């Protein structure tokens, strides 16, 4: 385990040496995701606790799986040398330009609802780690692609929120997995203004919004995400192409694909909100 920049382990309470000692000899049991957290349940020799390596990409992080002789990746912060079940060597490389992301070893705890910890956890059906979640991610609710996503609970939360619907969509304790890009796209598809109070949405409109979120996230996953530069790639280092499907985000000044009116960008919470002023009117 090579650590080039200790800042990438800032959420690991034991420091660099503890991270290295825990990972050396550990066996990766699976890969699980909830929202923007990704974790690898571990079997650590001599360790009775259920542990996992937890990763968060922050704004610019990447987790790449490389062959040992592959060219060095710029801005690599951590390298974990692996041996596959077939005896082949590989490298897990954590790359992060802005160092907002992190890796950490965290203890696993039972999920609140007794169901699998997150998306893809089902591949290990019957495994001891299946219904566990890292303590660092326990406060994050399920995302709309999760098989155990509780739509009724989210709709009930909407009814209690007077905040703008975009702010609610980005609240990881209401639902997870939605960033600025996909929030703008879901709101455009649903004809909703970003500042429309969540509580004013009818049940039908709220359900329509959640369904649009699901469809957009599913398509984005299928197309490898939205890659605008070298910071956004999959585990094999390949760029996604969902950017060609965008209707609102980054389309400032271009005609709306629905009505032809120019897409507008408003400054919002230190970022931007992209919307059609004709299709997405604020209704009071």
Feature-to-residue mapping (PLM):
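A cross-family signal for N-terminal binding/gating loops and helix N-caps
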Residues: 1-103, 255, 271-284
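Intrinsically disordered, low-complexity regions
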Residues: 16, 40, 47, 62, ...
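Phosphate/anion-contacting hairpin/loop surfaces
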Residues: 48-177, 182-189, 197
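Intrinsically disordered, low-complexity regions enriched in small/polar residues
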Residues: 21, 39-41, 66, 94-96, ...
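Basic, nucleic-acid-binding surfaces and adjacent catalytic neighborhoods in DNA/RNA-processing proteins
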Residues: 2-22, 32, 48-50, 153-284
